[in-house]
């Protein structure tokens, strides 16, 4: 099935805050520049690319020199407002170095829940892609309360990226994280942890491995990634979870190399488009 990834034309790339920021709260400019280069080159190759990016609050905290993330919703939304503007400025600068135009698309869950607004979003994304523009999608943190309260509607944009992938009928969602893939145990504490190369079904056993509340492995981060993977698989789409510290790994994925964990239902192999 990995070989079929070479045929992927429309890609959604999701990058999380942990990939965009250093642990000390500063912006990881090296990773962002590499990401801009990789995605711009994929466009040069003829691929259609959508970037789903977190990081508004993290970048806002850096811009405003806040040592810790604010706890109140109004403060978080104010920080997100500053951070989103700064984040797009950084993206525009780096993508511009490679001659690639980007466009901002901010979404909230209700927009994708209602048919008319969902259709508008689809039309906007299609229009951007037709013009060779890379849409940069983020949740609109200045108005979206649920994620800020950690009732996780989108869960650091994990689910949002899967929803976007379905909206545009993407061939592949690549989720760049701070972990190499999906493991049977915590690789940071278990030196013998084994990574899954491919998962064809999200079973209760797989969910249990991701960890739940109170487990030392999961704070919910991996669970939201599994939810996104399940959403993709139910839509007959493929998702790869891999480490985003070096975005050039995307080139290797597109060559069919065994990188990260591929989530794909078995029925996906027999999809109607004949490319798989």
Curated annotation (Swiss-Prot):
GO terms for molecular function: ATP binding; glutamate 5-kinase activity. GO terms for biological process: L-proline biosynthetic process; proline biosynthetic process. It is found in: Cytoplasm. Its main location: cytoplasm. Its EC number is 2.7.2.11. Catalyzes the transfer of a phosphate group to glutamate to form L-glutamate 5-phosphate. Belongs to the glutamate 5-kinase family. This is Glutamate 5-kinase. It comes from Listeria monocytogenes serovar 1/2a (strain ATCC BAA-679 / EGD-e). The gene is proB.
């Amino acid at each position: 099935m990995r070989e079929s990834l070479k045929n992927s034309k429309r890609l959604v790339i999701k990058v999380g805050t942990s990939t965009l920021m250093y642990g000390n709260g500063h912006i990881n400019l090296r990773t962002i520049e590499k990401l801009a280069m990789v995605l711009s080159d994929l466009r040069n190759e003829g691929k259609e690319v959508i970037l789903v990016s977190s990081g508004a609050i993290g970048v806002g905290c850096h811009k405003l020199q806040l040592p810790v993330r604010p706890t109140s919703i109004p403060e978080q939304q104010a920080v997100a407002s500053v951070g989103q503007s700064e984040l797009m400025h950084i993206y525009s600068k780096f993508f511009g170095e490679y001659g690639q135009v980007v466009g901002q698309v901010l979404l909230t869950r209700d927009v994708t829940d209602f048919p008319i607004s969902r259709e508008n979003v689809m039309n906007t994304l299609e229009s951007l892609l037709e013009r060779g523009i890379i849409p940069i999608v983020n949740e609109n943190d200045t108005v979206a309360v649920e994620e800020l309260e950690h009732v996780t509607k989108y869960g650091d944009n994990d689910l949002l990226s899967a929803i976007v992938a379905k909206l545009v009928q993407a061939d592949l969602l690549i989720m760049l994280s701070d972990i190499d893939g999906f493991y049977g145990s915590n690789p940071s504490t278990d030196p013998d942890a084994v990574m899954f190369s491919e998962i064809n079904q999200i079973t209760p056993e797989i969910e249990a491995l991701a960890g739940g509340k109170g487990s030392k492995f999961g704070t919910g981060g991996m669970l939201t990634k599994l939810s996104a993977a399940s959403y993709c698989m139910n839509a007959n789409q493929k998702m790869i979870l891999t480490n985003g510290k070096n975005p050039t790994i995307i080139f290797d994925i597109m060559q069919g190399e065994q990188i990260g964990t591929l989530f794909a239902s078995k029925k996906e192999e027999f999809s109607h488009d004949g490319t798989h």
